[in-house]
Amino acid sequence: WRLGWVAAPEKYIKAMTNIQSQTISNPTTFAQYGALEALKDNGQFPAMMRKEFVKRRDYIVEALNSIKGVRCIKPEGAFYAFPNVSYYIKGNIKNDVDLSAYLLEEGKVAVVPGSAFGKEGYIRLSYATSMENIKEGVERIKQALEKLG
């Protein structure tokens, strides 16, 4: 659930209300309470989460780069790693879509083919989960890729 608000000069607010639909004008009560708690936080929770995401990012990049044939540069934006896995696109694995399906079947890890984002030979992984899940997921990917040689 997401909740947002705008602080702007009156002329902009008036223009926004002219195009805004009723579907976004009455947020649910629990979302309003969540927003209130976020505003009371003074930025402590976001700062803590930024540190946590840096740890997760650094771990997943290092762990992926330790796998033979996988190269991952450190992302600077959202919480996704985007490693190059073209080394494993051979034989029965014809493309990153096949590799993603293989990782799901063999490793029980869901990844998104890079071709969905215009980059064939890559996969996208989210690190918006616990460190424990990240470690297990990367280990499963490693074991599955080792079977491919």
What kind of region is each of these model predictions?
Residues W1-G149:
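PLP-dependent class I/II
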